[in-house]
Amino acid sequence: WKWWPTLYKNLKHFRMTGGEPMMDVNTYKVFQYIIDHPKDDLHLNVTSNMCPPDEKLKAKYFNMAQEICMQEKVEHMMQFVSVDAFGKRAEYIRDGLDFNYMMDNVEEFLDRIPSRNSITFICTYNNLSITSMDKLLEKILELRKRYSKTYQRVWFDVPLLRQPAWQQITMLPESYQAIHEDNIKYMQDNSGEHNGLHIFKDFEIQKMQRNLAYWRENADASTQNKKNFYAFF
């Protein structure tokens, strides 16, 4: 912490990842420092599962985030939320995740803190994501329609999982590509210039298309990957 005040003076972007920042005392030290030393050009980013085991922790986190945003202590706060599928399938991927509780917390965050922040769902796209991605996309669109009024408050990203190899999308049977294609079609059907905050953007569609292209070019349903998939799942 000795170097923090010196660094902070010229800091433009600061991101806290996991573990779980809600459970780290240093998160609240950073928040308090920002509250005490407002910086109107700072972009504050935090990655969380949004599923804290203790309601007191959640209350502390939300209260401090609310003060930071509503009292304009920073330029913007981006709350990244790690979720790789929808519902029970997301819970299977991330041990300890309560999907409904997580989504309730996302909506509470957006309701309680209506300015200077956004949510980004980070879906590490893997072979367990494919079959419920449609429902996650539908939920994202629903949240955009509800919360994005003057600027986009609900984002998402689909970076490909590369390791372990047996969890990559590339080891799935070719027939699963049709599911991915249907998801791209759904996004295309809900794109365009009209009502620009409540649609899927071209660059978001392109990310899904790139994932599909990578899948087709690198398909590898090797016996060893199948054995590992079976052993772990």
Residue ranges and their predicted role:
Residues 3, 26-33, 60, 64, ...:
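A short acidic, amphipathic alpha-helical/loop segment
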Residues 3-10, 68-75, 105-119, 143, ...:
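A structural motif corresponding to the C-terminal end of an alpha-helix
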Residues 8-25, 37-104, 117-127, 150-167:
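Core AdoMet radical
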Residues 32-35, 66, 107-110, 138-141:
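Alpha-helical repeat scaffolds in large eukaryotic proteins
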Residues 35, 62, 103, 107-110, ...:
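Residue-level detector of alpha-helical secondary structure
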Residues 127-143:
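Catalytic cores of alpha/beta
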Residues 142-233:
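C-terminal accessory regions of radical SAM enzymes
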